[in-house]
Amino acid sequence: MSLMLEPNPTQIKEERIYAEMGLTDEEFAMVEKILGRLPNYTETGLFSVMWSEHCSYKNSKPVLRKFPTTGERVLQGPGEGAGIVDIGDNQAVVFKMESHNHPSAIEPYQGAATGVGGIIRDVFSMGARPVALLNSLRFGELQSPRVKYLFEEVVAGIAGYGNCIGIPTVGGEVQFDPCYEGNPLVNAMCVGLINHEDIKKGQAHGAGNTVMYVGASTGRDGIHGATFASEELSESSEAKRPAVQVGDPFMEKLLIEACLELIQSDALVGIQDMGAAGLTSSSAEMASKAGMGIEMYLDDVPQRETGMTPYEMMLSESQERMLIVVKKGREQEIVDLFEKYGLAAVTMGKVTEDKMLRLFHKGEMVAEVPADALAEEAPIYHKPSQEAAYFAEFQQMKMETPKVENYKETLFALLQQPTIASKEWVYDQYDYQVRTSTVVTPGSDAAVVRVRGTEKGLAMTTDCNSRYIYLDPEMGGKIAVAEAARNIVCSGGEPLAITDCLNFGNPEKPEIFWQIEKSVDGMSEACRTLQTPVIGGNVSMYNERSGEAVYPTPTVGMVGLVHDLKHVTTQEFKQAGDLVYVIGETKAEFGGSELQKMLHGKIFGQSPSIDLDVELKRQKQVLAAIQAGLVQSAHDVAEGGLAVAISESAIGANGLGATVKLDGEATAALFAESQSRFVITVKRENKEAFEKAVEAIQVGEVTNTNEVTIHNEENEVLLTANVDEMRKAWKGAIPCLLK
């Protein structure tokens, strides 16, 4: 009997065993007070994992409350598996993004794969069919062999899981900066579709109803994964490989189909994914949200390893498992349904009225804890916040324009920067056409997926320029949301809502907490102005290696509604003779830019600035022009500035180029990263109508010369670049670095 080895309650207290599990002295004293006695080993484990930052948001809740979370289309905000937004005709879109950073740092293939699996379960546990996946990835520089290994394995893991399960990976972003070398970021997003009447909640209602366990069996993988995600990575992290779970996408495919059939049955009361903290979080949260209790008999848990203790079963994060509550007396229907898919469905407990979570094993009660205490009563910490030392210094710097000798060489060098370069090497490994609903494939501003049976589409994107946020968290936070919305608009979509993944360093450091606060302030303001509420998300703290934090990276996942698929617009030029317009003014803004990083090897100074009211006005004008059929192509101006944006629009086309004239100082005109700018092409016959509808400046026209030529206001040629050569450089950059 392995139970003999577990320390008794007195030992747990005297030897401070709780501290190894992640509880502080004060927290352990709180547990003692809640229970009116010392907790046993299993109970200490339950509290340690439910009160971790990963599950309780105890360090970030005061900040998260600033987000606007309601709107006329919002059907479900934060608090359930995923958020839900109405898209009309009794349909809704369900989406969420989550991080799997720490597991991916030590076991990149499985870490990334199970990140994808977990976020898919969050979406179908709401009753939705998953229709698309996206991701947002950060790595160190590709010159490092370790980074190459992480990059290749993470991409393979995402591809391996998504392709097997048959959900298209349609978009995302990959950025490279030295600060991510020891701590990559892997954020996965899933989007699903649902009819209003099918929406399910993770709630355990109805005393006497049956608690069932469905899906894969439980092993020792991932024990304390949530706690592991709530501490900094160190050399000893390698030893925590067992805390990384192993995914089985074929099992999950069956689980999706079984659960979507289950949702049509009136026998189902509630359903929740066993994610972080496994059985503990699913049971405690479902009971707490319903104001009920749950009793569970752990001998009935399907186990794939022998001699598992209650502690191990409750804290395992084995994948592809769900906890469901069904009406009493209807259990056999559920067993039969899951059996049809070759899956186990086992009765393992019941709903009670007294709000307690009780666990039984081998005939004895092994834990008795108030469900609310686990799910709702974690301490909330108002961490000290202090402006980062570098901030004032950066703010006071006069922004100098970098010295550029040769504009053409600089453009080619920028196109080969891994953050700008083609990500085809990445997305060619993903099946982005499975389910045959993908209208706009990876590589344009946003992906678009058809809403079957309608003329509508969903536009989706992930965005975050972490460098801007490092330089100025509040301004950068605004830009992250605005850029996501700009990408949706350029694709013909109306921005609906966002999910976020807040990736930061250690919140116990006041300067890091300041970054969190300020970036959330900026994001919240942008969400209010652009009317894109936050409907759910995830916080990932402690992204540090050897005390060095990553850049603050609050990734934005946004979904927009394309009201009619004929509005779908992409970034590449369409035909020679079309007029090229630029919307928005260019300033000499180079802080955090690709050019600054490339020339100086570091970033400094002020980030670009943004006026959210101006941003909103421009987005509305562009979207109206697209919906009126006046726009041929649209592309947001981001990393690398106008020269890169115009080149990308040419690279995506076949045999087309452009002749363009840009005013102002040449380096800024070409490469500055000022916000709220678009490159738009318009048919000549629509010139008047377009200029009436949109404040834009005509800068040139699309040609069939296969060259991009840019002049200054004196009509001197700044650069002429062959589009085939640019395409070759842009497409070859990442494969070349990986060789």
UniProtKB/Swiss-Prot annotation:
Annotated GO CC locations: cytoplasm
Keyword terms, alphabetized: ATP-binding, Cytoplasm, Ligase, Magnesium, Metal-binding, Nucleotide-binding, Purine biosynthesis
Chain residues that bind substrate: S99, H100, N101, H102, R121, Q245, E317, S318, Q319, S540
Binding site for Mg(2+) 1: E98, N538
List of catalytic residues: H54, H100
Location(s), subcellular: Cytoplasm
Binding-site residues for ATP, renumbered to this chain: Y57, K96, D500, G537
Taxonomic superkingdom: Bacteria
Pathway as given in its UniProt record: Purine metabolism; IMP biosynthesis via de novo pathway; 5-amino-1-(5-phospho-D-ribosyl)imidazole from N(2)-formyl-N(1)-(5-phospho-D-ribosyl)glycinamide: step 1/2
A Pfam family of this chain: AIRS_C
Binding site for Mg(2+) 2: D122, D273
Chemical reaction(s) catalysed: N(2)-formyl-N(1)-(5-phospho-beta-D-ribosyl)glycinamide + L-glutamine + ATP + H2O = 2-formamido-N(1)-(5-O-phospho-beta-D-ribosyl)acetamidine + L-glutamate + ADP + phosphate + H(+)
Molecular function via GO: ATP binding; magnesium ion binding; phosphoribosylformylglycinamidine synthase activity
One of the GO BP terms on file: 'de novo' IMP biosynthetic process
EC number annotated for this UniProt entry: 6.3.5.3
Transmembrane segments annotated in the record for this chain: none
Family label: Belongs to the FGAMS family.
Quaternary structure note: Monomer. Part of the FGAM synthase complex composed of 1 PurL, 1 PurQ and 2 PurS subunits.
Role of this protein: Part of the phosphoribosylformylglycinamidine synthase complex involved in the purines biosynthetic pathway. Catalyzes the ATP-dependent conversion of formylglycinamide ribonucleotide (FGAR) and glutamine to yield formylglycinamidine ribonucleotide (FGAM) and glutamate. The FGAM synthase complex is composed of three subunits. PurQ produces an ammonia molecule by converting glutamine to glutamate. PurL transfers the ammonia molecule to FGAR to form FGAM in an ATP-dependent manner.
Name this protein carries in UniProt: Phosphoribosylformylglycinamidine synthase subunit PurL
Organism in which the protein naturally occurs: Bacillus cereus (strain ATCC 10987 / NRS 248)
